[in-house]
From Swiss-Prot:
The gene is DIR16. This is Dirigent protein 16. PANTHER family: DIRIGENT PROTEIN 16, DIRIGENT PROTEIN 24-RELATED. GO terms for cellular component: apoplast. Dirigent proteins impart stereoselectivity on the phenoxy radical-coupling reaction, yielding optically active lignans from two molecules of coniferyl alcohol in the biosynthesis of lignans, flavonolignans, and alkaloids and thus plays a central role in plant secondary metabolism. It is found in: Secreted, Extracellular space, Apoplast. GO terms for biological process: phenylpropanoid biosynthetic process. It comes from the Eukaryota.
Length: 243
């Protein structure tokens, strides 16, 4: 005796089989991933970052007696007046980069010398603690400063740890060239001297509206193919997105 199969059951079985087959051929797309290279230039003739508060900001703005943009040299027989915590203002006389905080730690003539001990004031805090630095950094498709420009990173980073080892970063990547032509917002803690830090993607505009995800931030040594007279910090930013 044969059991008559329901046409509805047969159709359901066929549709399920087709759906499984299509899913196997066309898996769900992976989250978009792309790279940015951020060039942060402190000091020199064409800086893209400038401290605006704290001791370092006072030096740049000429608010500390005898401080000059390209060096700190008191007049002959003159006595420098210390700032509020008793520390003397200090500036690299070669390119105007303060001996203090940046994305590469203490900067001397464009060299990354993260091994140098951070200068501390009488209160035990680094001289750059609390310094807010405004950035208009260049974003490129490759690690060289002459690579294809993708846009600008505009925002701030703040020396947020007492020992000068971290920077709180908040900036918008304004992507004006290449495949992407919209804005992404980033926020998080960058650890100076660490092999990798993570920033959160906190949204965006245009194509990246309601975007979320994270970015892996790795410090690199600048290639030096494009000579600059300031101190360059180079960051490789790998962005993982969902939107």
């Amino acid at each position: 005796m044969m059991i008559k199969q329901s046409p509805f059951l047969l159709l359901t079985t066929i549709l399920f089989t087709v759906a499984v087959f299509v899913a196997a051929l066309d898996p769900a797309p992976e989250d978009p991933i792309f790279e940015l290279y951020m060039h942060d230039l402190l000091g020199g003739s064409s800086p893209t970052a400038r401290p605006i508060t704290g001791l370092l900001g006072n030096i740049y703005n000429g608010q500390v007696p005898f401080a000059k943009q390209i060096g700190f040299t008191p007049p002959e027989n003159g006595i420098a007046i210390p700032n509020a915590n008793g520390a003397l203002p200090t500036v690299n006389g070669i390119n105007g980069v303060p001996l203090g905080t940046g994305l590469s730690g203490t900067a001397y003539s464009g060299q990354n010398l993260n091994g140098i001990q951070t200068q501390l004031g009488p209160d035990g805090l680094s001289l750059g603690f609390g310094t807010i630095t405004v950035i208009d950094d260049i974003l490129t498709s490759g690690p060289d400063l002459g690579s294809q420009p993708l846009g600008k990173a505009q925002g701030v980073y703040v020396a947020s740890s007492a020992d000068g080892s971290t920077q709180m970063m908040a900036f918008t990547a304004m992507l004006e060239g290449g495949e992407y032509n919209d804005n992404l917002n980033f926020y998080g803690i960058y650890r100076i001297g660490s092999a990798m830090s993570h920033l959160s993607v906190t949204g965006g505009t245009g194509r990246f509206k309601n975007a979320c995800g994270f970015a892996e931030v790795r410090p690199l040594i600048p290639s030096g193919q494009h000579e600059v007279d300031g101190a360059e910090s180079l960051l490789r930013i790998i962005v993982h997105l969902k939107y």
